Amino acid sequence: MAMLRVQPEAQAKVDVFREDLCTKTENLLGSYFPKKISELDAFLKEPALNEANLSNLKAPLDIPVPDPVKEKEKEERKKQQEKEDKDEKKKGEDEDKGPPCGPVNCNEKIVVLLQRLKPEIKDVIEQLNLVTTWLQLQIPRIEDGNNFGVAVQEKVFELMTSLHTKLEGFHTQISKYFSERGDAVTKAAKQPHVGDYRQLVHELDEAEYRDIRLMVMEIRNAYAVLYDIILKNFEKLKKPRGETKGMIY
């Protein structure tokens, strides 16, 4: 039978890594996960995440509504200039200029919440990755028979993969909010007389506020579900065949 020859010192390094990983995982389950569940549950109960009147989230839009008379005069001057100057490049440059209102700030209330949320997203993904690696290292050599414990490992691994996909999507969700809000602010600045664009900015802020609360809930639930399912099946996950077998990896 073909065998891969591994130097004893190399195997020793892998064994040290594996033992260290197992210790970290057991510490996570024994203390860190329960602590995070409690912390995130407390976060969800804070006034900052329980705003009943979402209109209080409204951030000021420093975009003045133009005077119709002055705008008409400005439009006439623009038409006159276009007649005199047919340079397409110059027209393109004029269109790319920023709005006359100056810079428009982010919604500070949303930004403050996101500054608290993003480290939590990073943390839960890293811990999930560590626990997933620990689980993979418990998978025994592929053999016929007595595979019920392996089936349990596979089910838990599927759950972890699903959680990882959901949590990774939070980064994209946050970036999408800023992109969409920036587009809405740009439209409101270019067409300040259109109230719908101004309202769109506020609607996006309210939607993101609701999403932030849901993301905190999902992170808390991820810790709780991982803690629960691993604790309930710890023996099967660690020793799927009732005894320690060689690693599949």
Swiss-Prot record:
Residues 60-102 are annotated as: Disordered. GO terms for cellular component: cytoplasm; cytosol; extracellular exosome; nucleoplasm; proteasome activator complex; proteasome complex. Gene3D superfamilies: Proteasome activator pa28, C-terminal domain, Proteasome activator pa28, N-terminal domain. Induction: By IFNG/IFN-gamma. Residues 68-98 have a biased composition (Basic and acidic residues). GO terms for molecular function: endopeptidase activator activity. GO terms for biological process: antigen processing and presentation of exogenous antigen; regulation of G1/S transition of mitotic cell cycle; regulation of proteasomal protein catabolic process. InterPro entries: PA28_C, PA28_C_sf, PA28_N_sf, Proteasome_activ_PA28, Proteasome_activ_PA28_N, Proteasome_activ_sf. Keywords: Proteasome. Belongs to the PA28 family. Implicated in immunoproteasome assembly and required for efficient antigen processing. The PA28 activator complex enhances the generation of class I binding peptides by altering the cleavage pattern of the proteasome. Heterodimer of PSME1 and PSME2, which forms a hexameric ring. PSME1 can form homoheptamers. This is Proteasome activator complex subunit 1. It comes from Homo sapiens (Human).
